[in-house]
Amino acid sequence: MTLENHYKKLYHESINKISSDNYHIDTLIDSKNDRRFGLTLIIRPSNEIKKKIQNFLKNFKEIEPNQYYYPNSDIHITVMSIISCYSDFDMSKIDVQKYIDLTEKCLLKGIDLNITFKGITASPSGVMVQGFMNNNELNDIRNRLRKEFKNSNVEQSLDKRYLIQTAHSTIIRFRKELSQKEKFLELLDNSINYDFGTFKVNKFELVYNDWYQREQYVKKIHEFVV
């Protein structure tokens, strides 16, 4: 299945669930007791693209002000969840340098990767921007990460939740019941091909993060310039 068809399938399946009130309300977003943390390799889109995302979100905020909208500081693409978030993960108990070294081996110099953010898709939990890669570089990196980490003796949980192959970015999460569901779905449908632009990937970040990649909890472990 092509990436475009994957996003379309996900969109239609999720819209059906949202329409029939089978969507997932995240009750942990506002919880003071959420102790889920992990280790993730991420890409951050350009400031220009983040500005377009915030402009895009304005109309949704007017219709559904009580949902969770990602600020610019938290918008990201997950390259790989190296340690998927779990309660009370303690970074002091791992050898951080080993994670940096293993990751660096997988990020070859001269990577030529552009990502186009065009259109939106959905999940039963929220709304995502569709990301399209100009080549196989990103998935090649993921395959190298899988090989290196699975052949190592460090703690890891690659692909534990799902086999990641996309370049999407979550921008809305449902934290309350949709108060104007029909208007929200109509706006989604009208925005399905929204063009956010293209950016060149020139760095990757290895971060310690909470489930939502919120700035106040994220600690940058290492930045890899490619």
Predicted features and spans:
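Histidine-dependent nucleotide/RNA phosphoesterase domain, centered on the 2H-phosphoesterase fold
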Residues: 1-226
